[in-house]
């Protein structure tokens, strides 16, 4: 349309990087669930009012799906779509994504759902040391 190729898509990930895979999974699950619960409550996304509000019917349809699948499955799906784990697990996740959509820009969120600052910083530093250099080499 604009006479040039579209830039890579921007992908946002709620990220938790740790050397211990089980610990990374447990932390990501706990804090993503906390984040998602606050999001649902703040925006009242589980109610049926959105489907009746002009301009918000799309959100109403999403809320209907959320009510149908339940909070646990919502968290599972959200968790599956974000990158967390050991540095290698994260690279594997990013590689699988790259194989599907090609190049992408990455916006990472290391602090969400009440993760303590120290843990978020440790996760970010490990990601910067062991994941980011490899991601940069793909560009």
Task: Go through each PLM region and give its residues.
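An alpha-helical appendage that flanks or caps ligand/catalytic pockets
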Residues: 1-103, 136-139
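Outer-membrane beta-barrel pore domains
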Residues: 78-86, 108-110, 115-119
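Intrinsic disorder/low-structure terminal segments
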Residues: 55-58, 111, 126
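C-terminal helical cap(s) of enzyme catalytic domains, especially alpha/beta-barrels
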Residues: 116-136
């Amino acid at each position: 349309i604009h006479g040039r190729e579209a830039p890579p898509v921007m992908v946002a990930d709620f990220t938790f990087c740790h050397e211990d895979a089980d610990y990374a999974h447990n932390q990501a699950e706990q804090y993503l669930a906390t984040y998602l619960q606050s999001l649902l409550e703040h925006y009242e996304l589980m109610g049926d009012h959105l489907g009746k509000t002009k301009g918000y019917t799309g959100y109403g349809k999403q809320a209907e799906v959320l009510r149908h699948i339940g909070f646990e499955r919502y968290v599972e799906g959200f968790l599956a779509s974000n990158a967390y784990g050991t540095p290698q697990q994260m690279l594997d996740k990013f590689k699988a994504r790259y194989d599907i959509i090609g190049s992408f820009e990455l916006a990472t969120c290391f602090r969400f759902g009440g993760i303590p600052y120290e843990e978020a910083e440790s996760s970010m530093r490990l990601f910067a040391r062991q994941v980011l250099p490899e991601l940069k080499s793909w560009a």
